[in-house]
Design a protein with these regions (language model features):
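Low-complexity, highly charged intrinsically disordered N-terminal segments
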Residues: 10-60
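Conserved alpha/beta-domain cores
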Residues: 2-17, 51, 55-64, 72, ...
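TRNA-binding/sensing appendages of the translation machinery
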Residues: 78-81, 96-108
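Active-site-surrounding "flap" and adjacent substrate/cofactor-binding loops of secreted or lumenal enzymes
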Residues: 114, 118-131
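Glycine-rich, proline-tolerant flexible connector loops at the mouths of alpha/beta enzymes
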Residues: 103-119, 202-205
Length: 265
């Protein structure tokens, strides 16, 4: 099995992910070891069995009186959003674009092989400390501008995707968990220190039980990383027919971490 990259082994300079990214010194750091062991445990892998409850069971949610936790200031204005993969040049251009939000995509626009997933995590960390840069073969240099940048939301892989490079009890782990876990471990506190937060776009959700599972992952992560409850926010993409019938329930399950629904592009 593979441990997550340590803070020291991640670099924001352009490079091919090396063995240092796959052999982590974070194992010697108790908080990192504790976080990762729990995060990748088999009990945290979502099981789709019996995931289709009767809508009558959730009628109280649809007719009840409840509300989500308040949104942070930087998620109040989302009139324009831009999306793209987590390669260096695309990220810099998106963050500099003037859009309200940049959805940094580890899913559909990103071929999910190991190099891309790990290099994407390197680039995400570089974006938060503003060290990310890129120079093309013609010598043109790209860097983050001074002043306002687009607010970044991370789209991990869906729950149906597995990651064969991280084994849990001899089996492939969840690609979604790997993306979420590496991002939170390396960037949750960085994002908060930068005046924003660890924000996600959740794809391919099919119902409120999947939303409940993500809510438990977020709450567990906040506790282990020592960040305030509700710091993690998620926008859920409604892109399956099943989720369209459970939108209220999805919002309710994620109410402490909810940042809205999106019907896709």
């Amino acid at each position: 099995s593979l441990a997550p990259p340590s803070p020291d082994s991640l670099s924001s300079s352009p490079q091919k992910p090396s063995n240092s990214l796959r052999t982590s010194t974070a194992n010697s750091i108790p908080v990192a070891r504790n976080y990762w062991d729990g995060f990748t445990s088999s009990t945290m892998k979502f099981s789709p069995e019996n995931a289709r409850p009767s809508l009558e069971e959730t009628r109280a949610v649809r007719v009840g009186d409840w509300q989500i936790a308040p949104l942070p200031d930087d998620l109040q204005d989302r009139r324009s959003e831009i999306t793209g993969p987590v390669d260096r040049k695309m990220m810099i251009n998106a963050l500099n674009s003037g859009a309200c939000v940049f959805m940094a995509d580890l899913e559909d626009s990103n071929t999910p092989h190991w190099h891309n997933q790990i290099q994407g995590q390197i680039n995400l960390r570089g974006a938060y400390d503003c060290s990310i840069s890129f120079t093309n073969p013609e010598g043109k240099h790209y860097a983050l501008k001074d002043g306002r940048l687009a607010v970044m939301l991370i789209r991990p892989r869906g729950l149906h995707m597995e990651e064969k490079h991280l084994l849990v009890e001899g089996e492939s782990s969840s690609g979604s968990l790997l993306d979420v876990g590496l991002y939170l471990f390396h960037n949750a506190q960085r994002a908060l220190d930068a005046g924003t937060g660890p924000y996600f776009y959740l794809p391919k959700i099919e119902g409120h039980l999947e939303a409940r599972w993500f809510n438990e992952v977020f709450t567990w992560s906040e506790q282990r990383l020592g960040i305030p409850h509700g710091s993690i926010k998620a926008t859920v993409l409604i892109e399956t027919i099943l989720a369209a019938f459970e939108m209220e329930e999805i919002i309710h399950e994620l109410r402490d971490h909810m940042a809205g629904l999106n019907a896709g592009r």
